[in-house]
Regions:
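An acidic-aromatic loop/edge-strand motif
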Residues: 1-13, 37, 58-143, 155, ...
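Regulatory/sensor and coupling segments of signal-transduction and defense proteins
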Residues: 6-11, 18-24
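Aromatic side chains
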Residues: 18-20, 134-135, 141, 184
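Aromatic-lined ligand-binding clefts that engage carbohydrates, nucleic acids, or primary amines
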Residues: 20-49, 81, 145-172, 199-201
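Generic structural detector for well-ordered beta-strands
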Residues: 21-23, 69, 105, 144-148, ...
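Generic low-polarity alpha-helical segments
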Residues: 22, 33, 43, 104, ...
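Solvent-exposed beta-strand/loop surfaces of large extracellular or lumenal domains
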Residues: 40-67, 164, 170-185
Length: 235
């Protein structure tokens, strides 16, 4: 964001403070802060009154986005993150959201969000509503399906509803198809066998949930295997 009050050139450089608070029911061992969008000549990062001295390293998202570990600075309860940013012109300031990453979920109660442990499993439906509001990445859903010889004589189409996201279809450990858009369907006939089969559906959602906190609905909303009769027509 641009500075809320534009000063004269004589007022620069100057220091701005950005001070959010984060509630944590536990502290993930891999908790990190993503550093992106700091416009200024330099910054100093503090957590709970302690200066973070670790050297930022490249994030998994982008070479320009850096991360620093925070697990050694966080505590259970209320945590205060403070960024002192030295600005040198009117357009300097905090231009992107601060982002925390790690192995955790986010619970909300009375309008307050809190870092909590990941749920053991997810149900079909929107994972944003299952304590993963800002997760961007891939979630895999796995089921066992038993098929007999009669069913194997038919063409078996797997169909799924993943909203506007990307679908990965795997059968018995083999990648069958990557569906980038509708129809989210794949012919799995050549990948199944008599008896038990493992069907894995991966859903890859938008990065906007992480980068912009948009809470776009994400997840596997429905899935089915539809059998079709095979016909041969000769002329």
């Amino acid at each position: 964001r641009q500075l809320p009050v534009e000063g004269d050139e004589e007022t620069y450089p100057g220091d701005l403070w950005y001070v959010p608070q984060v509630e944590a029911a536990f502290v993930p061992a891999d908790l990190k802060l993503m550093i992106d969008g700091f416009k200024g000549s330099g910054y100093t990062l503090y957590v709970n009154g302690r200066e973070v001295t670790e050297t930022p390293v490249r994030s998994y998202l982008d070479a320009e986005i850096k991360t620093v570990p925070l697990s050694g600075y966080f505590v259970e309860g209320t945590n205060t993150i403070a960024v002192k940013l030295t600005v040198t012109k009117k357009s300097d300031g905090m231009v992107d959201l601060l982002k925390l990453t790690g192995t955790f979920a986010v619970a909300e109660a009375d309008g307050v969000e809190r870092i909590v442990p990941l749920p053991g499993t997810l149900e079909l439906g929107d994972w944003v509503r299952q304590q993963l509001p800002y997760y961007s990445g891939t979630v895999y859903y796995t089921a066992k399906v038993a098929l007999d010889q009669e069913q194997l004589q038919r063409k078996l189409m797997l169909r799924a509803d993943v909203g506007k996201d990307v679908l990965l279809v795997k059968v018995n450990g083999q990648l069958v198809k990557t569906c980038l858009w509708k129809p989210y369907a794949a012919d799995i006939s050549a990948y199944v066998r008599e008896g038990e089969n493992e069907i894995t559906l991966g859903v890859v959602n938008t990065l906007m949930n992480l980068l912009e906190s948009t809470r776009n609905p994400s997840g596997l909303f429905a899935a089915e295997i539809v059998p079709y009769d095979r016909y041969e027509v000769r002329f």
